[in-house]
C-alpha cells in the first residue's frame, strides 16, 4: 500500500465520521449551477511524509504528475501570475480577460526585498540561505500578503513553506489554510514533495520530511460519494520518483527533469466538480 493512500484514507474517514458540516452557514464557494458548495471539515490536520522512504502520490486514483510539475514551476520558477504561461486550464476560472490571477502566488514570490546581502525575491533568498546559512531557522516563504489580498483572484491556500536543515537533510513544513481533500490534497503533497527534492539537490542536501499542516481540511458535499468509492479501492504500491541528478541550478529544472517509475493507479472515471 502506498503511504499516501493510507494517509488520505485515514484523513477522509476522520472527516466523514467526525467532521463538522457548514450547512447552517452562508458560504462563499458555489457550484457551476449557482448552488452553495457546503463542506464537512476537520480542523488542524497534520501529515508527515518521509521523502527518503517513499514518494507520496495517490494510487487510489491518478494524480496527474506532469501537470502538478507544470503548476509548481509556474509558481516557483517562472514566478508568474498569468495563465498564458501555464500548460493546462486549472486556473481558468480565476483568471481575468488578460489571463492574470492578480497579485497572487507567483507574483508574490517574484517581489524583491532588501537584505544585508542585497535585493532578492523569496525563492532566491531560500536558495541563498540553504547554501550559505543552512543552520538558519529563518528560511521560509510566505505569499499571504495582506496588503495585496484585495488584488488577488484567489487568496493563497498553500501559503507558507518553512525549510529546515538537519545535518545533510532538508526538511520542510507546508502550511495550508484550506484544503479541498478530493480535488487538491494529493496534488499539493506531490508538488511540494518535488519542491523539497529540487531545493535539496541544488543545495547539496538530501530530501527529508515534508510536514503538511492543514487548518481546514474539508470534503465538499458533491464529493462525498466519490470519496466513499475511493475508500473502497485497493491501494497499489508507491512508484519510484526519478529526478535528473545532473541539474544543479534550480532554474534549469523542466517538466522533463522528473518522472515516476512503476506508477499504476486504480482506474477512475468520475468527473470531479470544482467549487469556485
Question: Language-model segments: which ranges?
Answer:
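Terminal, non-catalytic protein-protein interaction segments that mediate quaternary/complex assembly
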Residues: 1-276
Amino acid at each position: 500500500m502506498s503511504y499516501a493512500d493510507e494517509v488520505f484514507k485515514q484523513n477522509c474517514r476522520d472527516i466523514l465520521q467526525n467532521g463538522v458540516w457548514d450547512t447552517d452557514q452562508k458560504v462563499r464557494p458555489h457550484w457551476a449551477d449557482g448552488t452553495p458548495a457546503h463542506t464537512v471539515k476537520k480542523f488542524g490536520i497534520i501529515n508527515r511524509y518521509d521523502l527518503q522512504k517513499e514518494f507520496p502520490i495517490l494510487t487510489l486514483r491518478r494524480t496527474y504528475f506532469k501537470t502538478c510539475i507544470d503548476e509548481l514551476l509556474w509558481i516557483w520558477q517562472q514566478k508568474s501570475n498569468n495563465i498564458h504561461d501555464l500548460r493546462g486550464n486549472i486556473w481558468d476560472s480565476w483568471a481575468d480577460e488578460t489571463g492574470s490571477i492578480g497579485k497572487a502566488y507567483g507574483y508574490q514570490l517574484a517581489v524583491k526585498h532588501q537584505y544585508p546581502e542585497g535585493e532578492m525575491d523569496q525563492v532566491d533568498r531560500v536558495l541563498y540561505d540553504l547554501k550559505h546559512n543552512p543552520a538558519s531557522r529563518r528560511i521560509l516563504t510566505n505569499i499571504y500578503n495582506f496588503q495585496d489580498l484585495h488584488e488577488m483572484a484567489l487568496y493563497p491556500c498553500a501559503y507558507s513553506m518553512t525549510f529546515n536543515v538537519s545535518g545533510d537533510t532538508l526538511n520542510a513544513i507546508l502550511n495550508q489554510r484550506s484544503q479541498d481533500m478530493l480535488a487538491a490534497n494529493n496534488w499539493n503533497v506531490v508538488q511540494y514533495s518535488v519542491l523539497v527534492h529540487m531545493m535539496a539537490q541544488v543545495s547539496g542536501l538530501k530530501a527529508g520530511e515534508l510536514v503538511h499542516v492543514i487548518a481546514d481540511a474539508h470534503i465538499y458535499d458533491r464529493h462525498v460519494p466519490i470519496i466513499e468509492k475511493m475508500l473502497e479501492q485497493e491501494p497499489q504500491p508507491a512508484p519510484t520518483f526519478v529526478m535528473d541528478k545532473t541539474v544543479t541550478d534550480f532554474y534549469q529544472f523542466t517538466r522533463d527533469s522528473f518522472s515516476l517509475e512503476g506508477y499504476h493507479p486504480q482506474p477512475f472515471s468520475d468527473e470531479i466538480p470544482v467549487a469556485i
